[in-house]
Amino acid sequence: MKETKNAEIRVPAEPYEFTFDPTRVALLCIDFQRDFVEAGGFGESLGNDVSTLRGAIAPTRKVLDCFREQDWMVIHTREGHREDLSDLFPSKRDRGNPTLRIGDIGPMGRLLTRGSKGHDIIPELYPIEGEVVLDKPGKGAFYGTDLETILRAGGITHLILTGVTTEVCVQSTAREANDRGFDCLILSDCTGSYFPEFYESALHMFKAQGGIVGWVGTSTDLLTAVDAAIPEIGESK
């Protein structure tokens, strides 16, 4: 980890500046899976236009590269279920398109099922050795996982959130994190929704009432703030 000029990195954000100690921050890449982001996956089976999510990939890659260069903690999540579906509630499987459900065969294998091609993370953001990959059975990344244990063990207090979709898995994770005392910065250009109105509403909810759930910023402002605190990043680009 490169030495910073100051103890804190200060990022312009809403409702006000987000500050973090670089030794206590982690990046969450939430559910950038083929099943949600690529054609032929679970998201498309529900009638969604998956192209609406792809705009979040490139800016997320820039943030991911920054965290990798600094050797800061990176955690990837994948929503999905065991092959025998023993961790899938009937109420969840029964929702959505009645002709194609979780566990059924799609173009990329069984939908939202661990071990299938669709369940895996997209190549553009694929984890490298040493990065945590959490398989979660629900929408929030804390439910049914050891995410909190990993964060506490690493001394993490602040989270940078990216991923899909804004109003479902990202929002659920942010709320769970907030209740556990973690400060969250959601990067608006590193997340996306199938529904533009849901995307906008979710971001407003995050930052409402003085940041009731967390802060909202952009990848550009985050990377600029890191560059200012750690000049070596900028010099190496």
Question: Where in this protein do the model-derived segments appear?
Answer:
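Catalytic-core segment of enzymes that process non-peptidic bonds
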Residues: 76-85, 91-92
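Short glycine-enriched, charge-decorated loop/helix-capping segments at active-site entrances
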Residues: 42-52
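Short acidic, Gly/Ser-rich segments with clustered Asp/Glu that frequently serve as metal-coordination loops
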Residues: 33-39
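Short beta-strand segments at enzyme active-site cores
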Residues: 72-79, 187
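Active-site-adjacent betaalpha module
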Residues: 1-26, 35, 53, 62-70, ...
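Conserved hydrophobic packing residues within short motifs/helices of P-loop NTPase cores
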Residues: 26-28, 75
